[in-house]
Curated annotation (Swiss-Prot):
SUPFAM superfamilies associated with the record: ABC transporter transmembrane region (SSF90123), P-loop containing nucleoside triphosphate hydrolases (SSF52540)
Organism of this sequence: Brucella abortus (strain 2308)
Protein name as catalogued: Beta-(1-->2)glucan export ATP-binding/permease protein NdvA
One GO cellular component term: plasma membrane
Localization terms from the record: Cell inner membrane
Taxonomic classification: Bacteria, Pseudomonadati, Pseudomonadota, Alphaproteobacteria, Hyphomicrobiales
């Protein structure tokens, strides 16, 4: 994007507060006009002194304009600061809301630290541009646009000096912009790398300390900082050169104005007051051109940050759902995967032609080796990704035709990583349902076998759990996650080995709670331990993205296929605890021929 396009798009964010923005612009224009009038009045004062005429009137007018200029400048500074601060927070909140509504696949591809860094640096750059626009940029443009015509009405020859000065500044600015464009983009990439390293290290500080990586990680940060310096310094050199050239041009112009003015006065072709006015014009123009140079520097520096931010904004805007998209209401829990295929880009992994049906209230256990596609199936159900082929239907409705909000409302998930916020215990449980009463929160905690350990904490339900639940044990974190799902009370439940972090006694309690929770709900269990799938109505054995076997636990156990091999490898007895059950005719599993599948 060109600098003007970047600048124009940045200014468009001010349109939300149109009245305040217009008020600031009008006030800025008045400040610019008053500033331009001051050299003219000062010249008249000097001319009156030289002519021994009336000095009181021009002096009084000059003082009045000066006082008005001070008050207007204070008004603009105060209003611009407040407006820029409000819009920075507003843009940050709006962008944040769009970011957290983006599918998980988008976040996984982009990276959390990258999106966060882009948002923070871009909003800071926008704040600076908005503030400078209302304080200086607009007044500078108005002053320069009116200064030359006013000067030309006084003396064309002296005006040419000012015009040449402006042309020189423009040429220097274009040269520096051309030379620093790629360099500034490289600087921004190095900033991202440095920030990502810091974020990655701090988020894994326990590993850093445990493996004594403090010195090596710090050295890596020094290397990133050195690379950033090496990219930044050439850019800074060009701007330093531009500053020197601009200063040389302005000094030379001032000397020319003085010499020409003195010459024209001695020849009787100009008055002393007019020369003084042109000296004021030259000083005003030099100051404004310096502001233009600083403005170009700011915009060039912000260019890479804002381009990336605008791309992120466009990406999130493109993924926003239409306002009239239908909601998924009154969910019963009948779920069909119909020849569903999805492959991760450039990986060769995914799921392929998966078909099965789950009746309302049934429990489905998904098993298989690592990388088999178990989690991918659940992600497809929740529309983390959309199928490349086939369709997923809930109660006969394609999930792609309903709003993500209503779909997420219908599904409660207990992740293997509990995913707790750095908030109180009650706030973390209340994530399941924000408007739940204290009694409902406590009831959910009791059902998840969490109530007793919560009350044992010094502050009970008001206890802060730390970042990602760092102040709790693994079992405590998992029980809060289960309580959250219980409180959400959704018709579809997803359990990613929800009891894996619990001790035997607690697991028995939580398993009972989970059984109660899954009663009359369609439940998916991503199983890493086969002991958790015995009570499932349907077992899906995944391998390399294909649904290799499907059926009841006992049916697959007796089939002698891959699932049976996995049972034996786990050391479980097939007849232990569960009597043999006959295979029910009219299975709800849709026939699916897979090459190489065990029959």
């Amino acid at each position: 994007m060109s600098l003007l396009k970047i600048y124009w798009r940045a200014m468009q964010y001010l349109a939300v507060e149109r009245t305040a923005t217009i008020t600031m612009c009008v006030a800025s224009v008045l400040v610019a006009l008053v500033t331009l009038a001051e050299p003219v009045l000062f010249g008249r004062v000097i001319q009156s002194i030289s002519d021994k005429g009336d000095i009181f009137s021009p002096l009084l007018m000059w003082a009045a304009l000066g006082g008005f200029n001070i008050m207007a400048a204070v008004f603009v500074a105060r209003g611009a600061d407040r407006l820029a601060h409000r819009r920075r927070l507003g843009v940050m909140i709006d962008s944040y809301e769009r970011l957290i509504t983006m599918p998980l696949a988008w976040h996984q591809k982009r990276g959390t630290s990258n999106a966060l860094h882009t948002l923070i640096r871009a909003t800071d750059s926008l704040f600076t541009l908005w503030l400078e626009f209302m304080r200086q940029h607009l007044t500078t443009v108005v002053a320069l646009a009116t200064l030359i015509p006013v000067a030309m009405t006084m003396d064309m020859r002296m005006s040419l000096v000012l015009i040449v000065l402006g042309v020189i500044y423009v040429m220097i600015g274009q040269l520096v912009m051309r030379k620093t464009k790629d360099g500034q983009a490289a600087v921004e990439k190095h900033h991202h790398k440095l920030f990502e390293h810091v974020s990655d290290t701090i988020s894994n500080v326990s590993v850093v300390q445990s493996y004594n990586r403090i010195a090596s990680e710090t050295q890596a940060l020094r290397d990133y900082a050195k690379n950033l310096e090496n990219a930044q310094f050439p850019v800074l050199n060009w701007w330093a050169l531009a500053s020197g050239l601009n200063r040389m041009a302005s000094t030379f112009s001032m000397v020319v104005v003085l010499v020409l003015g003195a010459y024209f006065v001695t020849k009787g072709q100009m008055r002393v007051g007019d020369v003084i006015a042109f000296i004021g014009f030259a000083q005003l123009m030099i100051g404004r051109l310096d502001q233009i140079s600083a403005f170009i520097n700011q915009t060039v520096t912000a260019r890479a940050k804002l381009e990336e931010f605008f791309q992120m904004e466009d990406a999130t805007a493109d993924r926003q759902e239409p306002e009239n998209v239908a909601d998924l209401n009154d969910v019963k829990g009948d779920i069909v995967f119909d020849n569903v295929t999805y492959e991760f880009p450039n990986s060769g992994q995914g799921v392929y032609d998966v078909s099965f049906e789950v009746k309302p209230g049934q429990t489905v256990a998904i098993v298989g080796p690592t990388g088999a596609g178990k989690t991918t199936l659940i992600n497809l159900l929740q529309r983390v990704f959309d199928p490349a082929a086939g369709r997923i239907m809930i109660d006969g409705t394609d999930t792609r035709t309903v709003s993500r909000r209503s779909l997420r409302h219908a599904i409660a998930t207990v992740f293997q990583d509990a995913g707790l916020f750095n908030r109180s215990v009650e706030d973390n449980i209340r994530v399941g349902r924000a408007n739940a009463t204290h009694e409902e929160v406590h009831a959910a905690a009791k059902a998840a076998a969490a109530h007793d350990f919560i009350l044992a904490k010094s502050e009970g339900y008001d206890t802060f759990v730390g970042e990602r639940g760092s102040q709790l044990s693994g079992g405590e974190r998992q029980r809060l996650a289960i309580a959250r799902a219980i409180l959400k009370d959704s018709p579809i439940l997803v359990l990613d080995e929800a009891t894996s972090a619990l001790d035997v006694e607690t697991e028995e309690k939580v398993t009972q709670a989970v059984d109660e929770l899954s009663h009359n709900r369609t439940t998916f269990i991503i199983a890493h331990r086969l002991s958790t799938v015995r009570s499932a109505d349907l077992v899906l054995f995944m391998d390399k993205g294909h649904l290799v076997e499907s059926g009841s636990f006992n049916e697959l156990a007796e089939r002698g296929g891959r699932f049976s091999d996995l049972l034996r490898a786990g050391g479980l007895k097939l007849e232990d605890k569960q009597p043999k059950q006959p295979v029910v005719e009219g299975s709800n599993v849709m026939p699916f021929p897979v090459k190489g599948a065990v029959a």
